[in-house]
Structures are given as C-alpha cells and as structure tokens.
Amino acid sequence: MTRKSSNRSRGRKARSGKSASSSKLQIWLGRIWSIGWKLALTLAAVLVFIGIYLDSMIKQRFEGQLFDLPTVVYARILTLEPGNGLSLQELRNELDVLNYRKVAQPRFPGEYASSSSRIELIRRPFEFADGPEPDRRVMLTFDGSGLNKIESLEQKRELGYLRLEPKLMGMLEKDSPEQRLFLRRDQFPEVLVDALLVTEDRDFYQHDGVSPLAIGRAMVVNLKAGRTVQGGSTLTQQLAKNIFLSSDRTLWRKLREAYMALIIDYRYSKDRILEAYLNEVYLGQSGADAIHGFGLASRLYFGQPLQELRIDQLALLVGMVKGPSYYNPMRYAERARERRDLVLKLMMEHDILTAPEYQQAVTRPLDVQKTAQIASRQPAYFQQVSIELKEKLGDKFKADSGLRVFTSLDPVSQSKLEQAIHDQIPQLAKTAGKDLEAAAIAVDRHSGEIRAMVGGKRTGYDGFNRVLNASRQIGSLVKPAVYLTALAHPDQYNLATTLEDKPLTLKGSEGSAWTPRNYDRQYRGEVPLYLALAQSLNVPTVALGMKLGIDQVSATLGKLGVNRDEIRPVPSMLLGSFSLTPYQVAQMYQTLTNSGKKAPLSALRSVLDLEGNVLYESLPRVSQAVDQQAAWLTTYAMKQGVQEGTGRYLNAQFSSAALAGKTGTTNDNRDSWFVGVDGREVTTIWLGRDDNQPTKLTGASGALRVYAQYLKYRIPEKLQLPWPEGITTFGFAKQTQGGLKLDCDNAFKLPIWDNQQQLKQQCENRPTEWIKKLFEW
C-alpha cells in the first residue's frame, strides 16, 4: 500500500473516531438535558406544591386567629360623678393604682397635677365595653363633701360624669405559656416602628420579604468578624420563623423561612406584617410565662401602656429584640443600657432623633420596675372569675381566644385588704402560732359585686382558696339570723323586748343535756333584745331561738342565701355549730345589711370577644329576701354592737363612720370571724388554722383587728341606713333588772317596727304630765 493511500485510510479512521465521539457526546448531553429538564420540572412541581401547602398554612393562620391570645382581665371601671362623695385623697389613691404620673403640668395621657382642692388630669384613651373613648383633659374640683364639678378643658363645659380606664389585672392561665396584649397597628407609636426598622430591617418597605442586600451586608460583617455576628433575616423572615418554624440552624429551615417570607409579603400589606411582628416578637419572661409583643413588654418592664413610654424606653425595648435574656435590664443593666444607646444612636444617624434629643435620651436612667410583673397577682379573685366564666359562657369560654373580661374588683380595696393581712398576721401569730391562716372577701353592700378577695396569708400564692373552699363553723355570726327571725314578728318582738339571761339546760331526745353559757360565764338576769345581739350573749340567743323554733331560724338562713342542707337542725345551730365558707357568710350578710335585698355575689360585669361582641353582661338581680324592716332593725343592732358591744374596739377609732359589725368565735377559739359593714362594703374576715387547732383568738382579738387595720388604709364610708316605712323611734327607760320599759318621753330612744301602732297608741293615751302630778298631789 502506498504512503498516500495509507494516509487516506488513517484520515478516514480519525474522522470516523471523531464522529463517533461527537455522537456519544450528543447522546450524553441529550440524556443530561432530558434528565435535567425532568428534574427541573419535578423540582418546579415540588416547589409549587410546597408553595401551595405553605400558602394554605399561612392563609389559615393569618386570616383566622393568628395568635393564642390570653383572656385579659380588668378591674372595675370607676365612674366619677359630682356629688358621689369621692374625696380628693381617694381619687389620688385611684390614680396611683392606675400608675398615673404626678407632674407640675399634665401634657400627655396618664399624667395629673394636684392641689388642695383640684386635680387636673389627662384621662387615657380606652376601649370600653360600649365603645372606645379618646384621651380627655379634665379639671376636677372638690369641696368638703367631695367631688362637686368635672370640667372638660378642651370643650370648656361641665361634664355629668367621667369614666377612668380600668386597671389591667392580668391574664387568665391557659395551656400555652405565651402571653401577649394585642394592639392594632395604629396603636403602636410611630417612633417605635421607626426605631425597630432602622435597627432590624432598614429595607423593609423596599424588599419582597427577603433582602439580598441585607444578606450581603451581613456576610461582609460576619467575614470581617470571623464569626456570625449579624443575621440577614428580614422582619418578615423572623415573623415566619416565630409563627411557623423552629429555631433550628439548618439550611432547610432557612429555605422554608425565606419561601414563607416571600408568600407573606406577596399576600399581605406591610402594615399587616408589622402588626403581626410587633405583637409576636418575644421580649422576655414573667415567671413561667413567655412575654410576646411590645404591648405586654411595656407593662412588664415599665408598668405603663406602650403609648406613654419615653423615646429612651422604647429604644430599650427595641434593643431587647436581639436577645431578651442577654439584654434583660433587670439583670444586666449596663449591658441593656449600651444596647439602648446603640439604638438611640442609629435613630439619630437616620434623622429619627435630633442631636439634642439623642443627648437627652442617653442620659436618662433605665427606669424599669423593681420586679418584672405585668400586674399585681390576685389568684383568689382570678379563681372566682374563672368559675363564673365557665358558668356564664359554657362552651363559649376558651382561655386562648382573646376575651376581654371586665370585673368588679376594686384595686384599692384589694391592695389595702392584702396589706392589712400582711401587717396583722405576723402580730396575731405570736398568740395563735405560726400556722395561723386568713381569708377575706369584700362585697358591695347593694349590688353584691365582689370588690376584693384574699384566699390566704400568702396573698399572691395560687393555691388553696379559703374564701371559696374553707368551710368552717361560724359561731356567733349566726346570731343576727336568730334576731332577724324574731324581729320579723313585730307584734311579738322589737329591739326593746326583754330576754332572759338565766341558766338554761336543754334536754335531747336521747336523754342528753346541753347547757349553753355566755362567753364571760356571767348571767345578767334580763337584757333588752338589741343588747343581747350587740354583746353577742349566748344564753338569751338560744332561749329566743328555741322559742321561735329551729326550723324558723333555719328558714331565715335559707332566705339569706345559706344552703339549708349545710345546717343540722339541733339547738347548737343557734350558736353557729354548722360550717360555711367566707363566701357564703358574705352572701348572708350582704342580704341582711342591704335591708333584706339579696343580690347574688358576682365578680363579672361584662365579657367581650376579640371583635368586641358582648358575650355576657351582668344585669341587676336584686330580690327582697326577708322583711325590709326586720333586716334594717337587725343591722341597727349590729351598729350598736360596734358602739357598745363586742366590736367597740372599732368605735374608738372610727366613730364617725357609724359602722356595723359582728364578731364570731367558735369552740376552743378555733375560728376567729368578723363581718364589718360601712357605707361601701360588707367585709368578711376569717382567721384560723388549716388543721383546725385552737388559735387562742376570739373574733374581737383576731379578725376584727385585721378589719380595723384595713380601715386605716381604706378610709371607711359612713354607713347611713335610710329609714324604711313603718319604723318609728320610741323612748324607753332602763329597769333595775336590766330590761327596758316604754317611757315615751325618755331621752333614750330605739327604732321600733310598730306595724299595728300598739306603742303609738300607748304613748298617745298616756296621762299628760300635769295630770300625773295632780294625782301625785
């Protein structure tokens, strides 16, 4: 073969090899392309599927209830009206409880100025049950009788009334540990939003949920630092993570976070996203509760509504977003201050603050509360609220559905009652022993609304509530029911009726004998009915009760609100040998001292759902349970008990208040009771031991002392009892045997229900003085 033909042969082989290689490459590329586009299509389908799933999940949360919202509980709404007797000092106390700030000249909501006869204040805006009310600048003028004028300084006119916003009591316990106070977007101060964006997400209004610029900026900072010191997540990404994802540092979580942020940004407005973030962000702990949202964090750290915080305080909260535990101002004050000042500096650099404003803000102290708490704890009262919510709402009650509950709690009464127990129990325990316990409840005398409740000497302890659950013998607290039963028969009994105080022995059906004795072991021979009750004498009470009949007294107790199944019909029940809770005693005495009108005890006033719909509203349910005149006369005798009977310790300190009261002591001094009544409240106090051992305390030496301490803090309102129809005063002369005799002209007077006008006729038919002298001559 020639060289030329050989070369041609090699050329053909080379071309053939190249052609084969090219063909293989094309086949390989074709396969890659085929696999690639299939994979891409599959990936796209997966992404679409994931997107649809994530979109559905986001829509379900955002267009339903985005958060678990706690049931928010408020104290009573105080309505100020000229002529209602409210003193200037009492209003100051109310404003202090509501954390109003005393200043020289009010400029902002939540501030007031005070003089000797005036208070100028700017009432905070609040969304009441019947609608929202804006902030309002008013001048309140007082005279010797109390509040006499309310003037709107903006409208230059007098107002008939003014409502103060209620105190936030706290949130009811729920399954989730998250707690938040939801605010609408327009309720957040704009300077807070500006500070947050300049610190956490400067491109918020420009990006679509994910910010490549922020990611790049974070990468540069982290590379320079040699470690992760700055994240590139937008607020939208943080929101997606907080609501839907865990905090795991994985690529898969970051990808889902970014994808969800894009969907959220596409579906919802920037303001809607901001509202969600501002209410969702975690900002610390209060015990076991996780505090979410700026609204509740403001209450936790500063004890003030968010709208009233200074710029430096808002900056502190914004600074804590990066690490609430690390920058906790209550534990790491200097670290928190540095972070706050950094936020303030960023605000100045971005023209949110001027240089002078910045300088003023960085020089301010942190001004956080001494202890991190949302509100004062009233666990006993909260238990009552929970019970009533379940009773009134049934299946509608869900603790995480954002209900707003308005109660009748009086924050001044509550705090002063707690303070009285804190002060007195250590002193009384020196006599009774360290295991001495307490329970107390104060109710409105007319409406039956529960104004305060303390379940034990550890007032903030959420445990056994003795007001509701400690059923103890009531001792002499039963006696007014015995005398009420008698006074309901005015043709047979009145306050001047003579009762025998002589040795008495009662025989039982099985031959047993019971001999009641007075506490002092003395017998007085004869005693007027009113004094037997005032001095809480046992023997006359038992004698009277047996004459009336045990069933009759038991029926009276039933009318006053006592479950008759609790009462064993034996003679000793006339001295309180049966057991009631302080709650049941409070109901009994509310009815008695309200001229026989029973108003069921209640803590709820109204309940609103998240949209503001009224789910429950309390309506007056007062009924005449016992004769008005008989109840009034019994209460009068209880007033005498404070003046000259077992409650006279009170009269020495509060004589001008004309108080009524009743002591109660059980066998071996196991229980010490006192029920005190002023013009405002019926307050029931019990002292004893959970193991039912003796305390060495009587009602007068124990529970009454707690009540007296309470009145030192909570100035009593004078008890005025409007005279019912048919009650007339008559003169009586004291007899040597101890009883009373009608003496129409005598200076010593007693009110009498003279329904058949027997005493009136006796006085009208008596001989005149000159005729008597004539016969004497």
From Swiss-Prot:
Compartments where located: Cell inner membrane
Reactions listed under catalytic activity: [GlcNAc-(1->4)-Mur2Ac(oyl-L-Ala-gamma-D-Glu-L-Lys-D-Ala-D-Ala)](n)-di-trans,octa-cis-undecaprenyl diphosphate + beta-D-GlcNAc-(1->4)-Mur2Ac(oyl-L-Ala-gamma-D-Glu-L-Lys-D-Ala-D-Ala)-di-trans,octa-cis-undecaprenyl diphosphate = [GlcNAc-(1->4)-Mur2Ac(oyl-L-Ala-gamma-D-Glu-L-Lys-D-Ala-D-Ala)](n+1)-di-trans,octa-cis-undecaprenyl diphosphate + di-trans,octa-cis-undecaprenyl diphosphate + H(+); Preferential cleavage: (Ac)2-L-Lys-D-Ala-|-D-Ala. Also transpeptidation of peptidyl-alanyl moieties that are N-acyl substituents of D-alanine
Sequence intervals crossing the membrane: 31-52
Periplasmic side: 53-777
Membrane topology of this protein: Single-pass type II membrane protein
Single annotated GO MF: serine-type D-Ala-D-Ala carboxypeptidase activity
Biochemical pathway: Cell wall biogenesis; peptidoglycan biosynthesis
Residue numbers spanned by region Transglycosylase: 162-334
GO biological process terms on file: cell wall organization; peptidoglycan biosynthetic process; proteolysis; regulation of cell shape; response to antibiotic
Cytoplasmic domain ranges by topology: 1-30
Region span, Transpeptidase: 415-709
Pfam families, per the entry: Transgly, Transpeptidase, UB2H
Role noted for this protein: Cell wall formation. Synthesis of cross-linked peptidoglycan from the lipid intermediates. The enzyme has a penicillin-insensitive transglycosylase N-terminal domain (formation of linear glycan strands) and a penicillin-sensitive transpeptidase C-terminal domain (cross-linking of the peptide subunits).
Protein name per the record: Penicillin-binding protein 1B
Species, as recorded: Vibrio cholerae serotype O1 (strain ATCC 39315 / El Tor Inaba N16961)
Phylogenetic placement of the source organism: Bacteria, Pseudomonadati, Pseudomonadota, Gammaproteobacteria, Vibrionales
Gene name as annotated: mrcB
